[in-house]
Amino acid sequence: MDARTWRLGWRCLLLLALLGSTRSEGVESCEEVRKLFQWRLGGAVKGLPEAPRAGPDLQVCLSKNPTCCTRKMEERYQIAARQDLQQVLQTSSSTLKLLISRNAAAFQETLETLIRQAENYTSILFCNTYRNMALEAAASIQEFFTDVGLYLFGADVNPEEFVNRFFDSLFPLVYNHLINPGVTDSSLQYSECIRMARQDVSPFGNIPKRVMGQMGRSLLPGRTFLQALNLGIEVINTTDHIHFSKECSRALLKMQYCPHCQSLMLSKPCMGYCLNVIRGCLAHMTELNPHWHAYIRSLEELSDAMHGTYDVEHVLLNFHLLVNDAVLQAHLNGQKLLDQVNTICGHPVRTPTQSPRCTFDPSKEKHGMKISARNGEETLANRRKEFINSLRLHGSFYGGLADQLCVNELAAPEGRPCWNGEEIVKSYAQRVVGNGIKAQSANPEVRVRGTDPVVNQIIDKLKHVIQLLRGRSPKPNKWELLQPGSGGGMLENSSGDCDDEDGCGGSGSGEVKRTLKITNWMPDSMNFSDVKQVHRADHGSTLDTTSTGCASGTESMALPLMGTLMFLPWLW
């Protein structure tokens, strides 16, 4: 035999030994075990066996053969086995966790942008149409949309209260500038009396009630949707760091590290053996599966139902139209309101005043928000649909987790020599049990006892959020779905369930039916107490915020003209 043939044969034998395809009989040194122990666990090699020996003190890695392990090594290996399983759990859930967390952040950012645009539209309405009261209305507009954001993102604020507060603060401005224009009372007490009288004299008709209904129907589902996404992240974070029982830890040690004691460092467990161990360890987690599936289904149902007056995007971007209707209604009933206010609050001290008007500061033009033209309409509803379609792929995540870990990470391929808990064999001979707690009564590798309080708590939270999600989903025959009409406005659904209070009809000045385009831009800086200006552009539009208000030029604009300019197709 020449030297080349001898070297090749030696390398083959060495490779077979490293692959764990040979028994540990005849192993004379524990040097490789010592090195791997030090590298993997960072432990000192002092005191570790240099050669295989009897291990009478071992509790899990029992063998009739000499061993390279000690009791202390066994304890360290058991900790490492638990950490290894947690690591593969976190790796397996990382895609799902990233999907939910990124979309939760994107939805929140998009809602923040929607609120800013809706505030801009409302400010534009006053600046272009009711210029005399624009600066005075700015604080109330800002406060209203701040409350909208607080509510959407989970704060304890009441939509009915902030809607009433907005219209209460609007009435004195409308009274002083439209109903009794050119004169005002220097006393704050008189303005406060007008504000307090708003709900009694109803200057805006049923519009505040319509706004309350629309805000309630749209903001609450949006708020619940965001809260549900955050709970989904919490569920994954909790299961990523689940506590494993003592029986599970011993089984993991036996499966993952007991081969090391026989110098079989690169061996992998048999598929059936791995399934029994991991299904036993994750038995309680598997019980999450039906609730997780129902959670995703409930998210989908709520998302599908968020249309028309249930769609926060539609409601926010059309809020200014209802405000315009409210101001017009008060103006049309001016004489009646004048008499009612005089009866309740008395006659004002007639002091001619000049209200501050909108002006445009060109130096602030750089703070404008540019909306670029895009090939498609990427709306919040479309983004929700894409997210739900991706999330649906993970509907059985917890039910198939054990199988996924064994197939993709832990077990040897079928037909290959593998570790069965005692030695290297061609196949696993024990019965393979199914998933779930009930199936584990016959598990030969892991004894599963009782219930897991942490998993039970997660299940309770999922049940609760499922009830919330389903409670926020309107029944199909109650949806106020808005469909594009041939005249450029919106048509009510044919069910007859949608009335004026539902807000299905527009004001006639151009309802915003196609909504926010989700873009990558964000304004450099914005001051939302400012009054806003809109400029036309050939291939897009620019919403500019200025420190003092709107464009100079015509002192007032007719409502139809303002609506036409604001809602031309190029704005979208």
UniProtKB/Swiss-Prot annotation:
Localization (cell): Cell membrane
GO biological process: regulation of signal transduction
Keywords for this protein: Cell membrane, Glycoprotein, GPI-anchor, Heparan sulfate, Lipoprotein, Membrane, Proteoglycan, Secreted, Signal
InterPro entries assigned: Glypican, Glypican_CS
Glycosylation sites: N120, N237, S486, N493, S495, S507, S509, N527
Keyword Iron-sulfur: no
Family label: Belongs to the glypican family.
Name this polypeptide is given: Glypican-5
